Amino acid sequence: MSGLSHHHKSRLFLTVLEAANVWLATLSPITRKNYASGIKFLVANHILDGSMKLEGLVCCDHCDILNRIKSLTFTYSGKPVSEASKQARAACYISFTKFLYRLTKGVIKHASPSKDFGNPTFYKIRDKVKTEFISKREWLLFFDALKKISFRDYLIGKLIIQGVRKLTEVISLRTEDISFAKNQVTFKVKKRQNRYQEVKVSYPNFLMQELQDYLGNREGWVFVSGEGQQVAINQVYYYFKLAEGDINSPIKVTPHVLRASALAYLKKMGFADQEIMRVSCLSSTQMLSAYDTGMTDNLTSQLPLIF
């Protein structure tokens, strides 16, 4: 460590929470919210000491910390900790240490997940996604209610479900991403290592006409607030909740639920996996199969009676 410049040494005198705040500020809104919750969890459960200087992590055994996270059964307040929660906190810690590795130019090493057979840090918890789906009838009722409340958020939801898109992709649209002549919208899909992939999605005439009516002659962000700024995620969730309440939906209707419902619907309708993967940007058939709502018959039901 003696070879470090003074600039890099000074970073080791940041506290864990100070460094975490710097890290969180570099993340996208949804990731920031999730990882802020993760850091708070790790500090509250004495996995991390928020007041400790970063120099205390130089000789830290990351494997021990990951094992402590994975060994939790209850929080300090007595709440049970699920496997999904433990894996999410472990992912948060690993990502945080990778940031510290970059921040300190390698002085603090980053944590790596264990792949030991029988005790891996990460493993598949369930075959099917936990998200509840809504039926076509339910989303038609939802959109009727949403259209009366907020035409902007109605259009956002329509682009999500018709194009199998994520909310962040839709609210990031700019007017130059839309070709009304081709009935086509170009989405920028974020991939790993801050790379972006452009995905062109064709929409039906009536939806493109509604979008054109909403835009008028405006340029810039497609979906804007009353002040003309890019619409915030929480605004969309607010109006979705109002529409959900109007139809007394037993299922919480969120942008994620709309996208998941679209994937489940396409699978149910028998569209080819490769086609669904191409438009949704899912990277494997295994990921797509998690949205398959079809019941698989037990093999024995297809055999002749033995007795």
Swiss-Prot record:
Residues 129-304 form the Tyr recombinase domain. It comes from Chlamydia psittaci. The keyword Metal-binding does not apply. GO terms for biological process: DNA integration; DNA recombination; establishment of integrated proviral latency; symbiont entry into host cell; viral genome integration into host DNA. The keyword DNA-binding applies. Belongs to the 'phage' integrase family. One of its GO terms (molecular function) is DNA binding. This is Virulence plasmid integrase pGP7-D. CDD domains: DNA_BRE_C (cd00397). Gene3D superfamilies: Intergrase catalytic core.
